[in-house]
């Protein structure tokens, strides 16, 4: 058993969850969490595999404005499972192509580096507060984003290869495929399977999904009130934020 490889996989998983849940979602999109400016920028750079900050925030806010209605960019009710899961990133409804994209892992980072900052930008106007920050505007530009994400991917490959050779690279591919699919499952599975709390949309609380997505699986609660840090005391997000708060790096709503 390669203990160092296991630790590296766990750290990668944690950073993947922090990127989507704490940074892009709760901090940038909904302003539920306030981080020290320098620390926020550092964490956004680490979150770049999830997409550019401007595009991610704009698309997510559009989703909240038109949840499961005309105008929702990734509703499984409107477009089917695979388009909602990951096809909307690449504007493709072909099940096989969507499936290949979903399992691409580290190769998805290289593809996204070119594709994401150049496509699906129609909701960027909803993230003007993000693009008004010069640093976020700069790293969201196509060439800058591509270079940073490709460097990010190369560094990950070198780290995992140095730990366990080809096996390390295979495990890197697997953990990234898992992280991407867990994040994408919030847009697909959490709008199909689980418990509804109202009839205004199809968002559902999926407790099994919540266990692996830093509480994001409590999706119906989030859509009912996006200004509350959902499920905060029942997942790792709470403990991470408490640690950050102790060091004066974060403030968050209780």
Q: What positions do the PLM features span?
A:
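Glycine/small-residue-rich hydrophobic helix-like segments
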Residues: 185-235
């Amino acid at each position: 058993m390669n203990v160092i490889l296991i630790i590296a996989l766990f750290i990668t998983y944690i950073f993947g969850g922090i990127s989507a849940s704490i940074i892009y979602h709760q901090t940038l999109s909904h302003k539920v969490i306030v981080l020290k400016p320098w620390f926020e920028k550092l964490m956004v750079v680490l979150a770049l595999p999830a997409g550019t900050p401007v595009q991610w925030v704009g698309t997510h806010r559009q989703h909240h404005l038109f949840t499961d209605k005309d105008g929702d960019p990734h509703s499984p009710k409107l477009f089917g499972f695979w388009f909602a899961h990951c096809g909307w990133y690449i504007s493709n409804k072909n099940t096989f192509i969507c499936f290949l994209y979903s399992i691409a892992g580290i190769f998805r980072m290289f593809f996204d580096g070119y594709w994401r900052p150049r496509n699906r930008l129609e909701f960027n106007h909803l993230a003007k507060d993000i693009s008004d920050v010069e640093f976020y505007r700069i790293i969201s530009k196509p060439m800058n984003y591509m270079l940073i994400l490709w460097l990010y991917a190369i560094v990950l490959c070198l780290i995992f290869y140095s730990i366990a050779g080809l096996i390390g690279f295979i495990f890197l591919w697997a953990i990234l495929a898992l992280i991407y699919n867990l994040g994408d499952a919030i847009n697909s599975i959490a709008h199909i399977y689980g418990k509804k709390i109202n009839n205004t949309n199809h968002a559902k609380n999926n407790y099994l999904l919540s266990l692996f997505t830093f509480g994001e699986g409590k999706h119906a609660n989030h859509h009912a009130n996006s200004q509350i840090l959902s499920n905060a005391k029942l997942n790792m997000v709470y403990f991470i934020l408490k640690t950050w708060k102790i060091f004066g790096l974060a403030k968050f709503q209780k």
